[in-house]
Amino acid sequence: MTTVAQKHFLEGQTYSVPLIQPDLRREEAVQQVADALQYLQKVSGDIFNRISQRVETSRAQLQAISERVTLAQAKIEKIKGSKKAIKVFSSAKYPAPERLQEYCSIFAGAEDPSKQKWPRHKIQSKHRMLDEKSLQEKLKYFPVCVNTKIHQEDDAEEGLGSLPRNISSLSSLLLFNTTENLYKKYVFLDPLAGAVTKTHVALETETEEKLFDAPLSITERGQLDRQVAENYFYVPDLGQVPEIDVPSYLPDLPGIAADLMYSADLGPGIAPSAPSSAIPELPTFSTESVEPSQADLQDPGLLPPPPPPPPPPPPVMPTTVPPPPPLPQPTAPSEPARTASEDSSKTVPAASVQGAPKEVVNPSTGRASLLESIRQAGGIGKANLRSVKERKLEKKKQKEQEQVRATGQGGDLMSDLFNKLVLRRKGISGKGPGASANPDAPGSPAGAFARMSDSIPPLPPPQQPPGEEDEDDWES
């Protein structure tokens, strides 16, 4: 009967070819060699079959990729010479499966042929006798390492020695209430105090412990350099771009589209952009030029006075001209001066522009249209303006009325006291009701001041040229 050598398996190893042992009988060695060669043939055949299947699978995948490349190349060749703009849509996701296929080993599912039942052979020859001489010859070629070193016992024993035979439990082996094995390492330890474990050698050689040396930053008065944190963020840079002086448009170029202005349904955008409805659409205005009337070109002295015109419609203003600000209301003495200036302004252009073109006589500029709109609005005479002095007097009267109401509505002690103090101050200053009731009394200071002010003649009003009044005193 043949014996097969023991096989040693590795991690992930599927096949294992047996080795033939030496010093076998001839018939036994021949049988083991035949069985090993037969096993090796089966293993090699299985390995090459699996490699061929994997190569065929990879070749099919490569063929599919080649077909896709050929199809894409044909599409590129078809549109290569076209001059029309082509819209290309890109997929939002990468064209790959969500879950990648895991790698499968080429030997997945393989079975070891050695697990099959081998035939049994009956050997007729007998074993040879052991020969010491042949064994000594083999030791020359097959070195045998034998550890002949004698283990020397340790002189310094730390524990109590070997374990006694009468120990029957773990509690009798360890020191009470601790995890120390005294037979292995003898320690001086109080089981109830929980002190630090110290051997008798450490107790004998124990010395005073010193503090560690100070670090170099303290002893040498050195300062550590602050490390600058490295920035690993991606900062794109345009880099060096060469300057090329070429025209902006080159017609009839091969492979360049000429009809870039095309309309197509783009659909919803990918990036979050601002909605187009946020920009308001401005209305369109029709700009009408203000044509001068023929009456302005004629002499106003030869024409009869025109009838009162109807109320004019709102003037059509250009989009760029702002509305005119209101002008101050003139006083009565400035009316004749204004009419005289208007008559002179009408007569002077009529006399100086004889034979001039229409555009020169009446320029249609923004300033002329602004003056025309002011004339149509009525000018200074129709403006509803009010003097600032009148407004100040009204505010003063309103303030006095509020104070009188406050004095009449007082109900508590503090308000009555406050009102009396106010009346006393007014009486002292000559502004109270007592002073105004009897201004001619000899002891009243208000009456004396009033008589002195009456004796002083009023100042004449300042003479101002017409049209140069202070505009700060007028408010709409």
Swiss-Prot record:
Gene Ontology terms: biological process: Arp2/3 complex-mediated actin nucleation; endocytic recycling; endosomal transport; exocytosis; protein transport; retrograde transport, endosome to Golgi
GO annotations of cellular component type: cytosol; early endosome; early endosome membrane; recycling endosome; recycling endosome membrane; WASH complex
Region (Required for WASH complex assembly): 1-54
Domain WH2: 366-388
Domain of life: Eukaryota
Pfam families with a match to the protein in the record: WASH_WAHD
Bias (Basic and acidic residues) ranges: 387-403
Pro residues bias (residue ranges): 302-333
Region (Disordered): 273-412, 427-476
Alphabetical keyword list: Actin-binding, Endosome, Membrane, Protein transport, Transport
Compositional bias annotation for Polar residues: 284-296
Residue stretches of biased makeup (Acidic residues): 467-476
Region (VCA): 354-476
Any one GO molecular-function label of the UniProt entry: gamma-tubulin binding
Record's keyword annotation contains Protein transport: yes
The keyword Protein biosynthesis is annotated on this UniProt entry: no
Subcellular location: Early endosome membrane; Recycling endosome membrane
Family (UniProt): Belongs to the WASH1 family.
SUBUNIT field: Component of the WASH complex.
Chain's role: Acts as a nucleation-promoting factor at the surface of endosomes, where it recruits and activates the Arp2/3 complex to induce actin polymerization, playing a key role in the fission of tubules that serve as transport intermediates during endosome sorting.
Domain remark text: The VCA (verprolin, cofilin, acidic) domain promotes actin polymerization by the Arp2/3 complex in vitro.
PANTHER family, alphabetized: CXYORF1 (PTHR23331), WAS PROTEIN FAMILY HOMOLOG 2-RELATED (PTHR23331:SF5)
Identification of the protein by name: WASH complex subunit 1
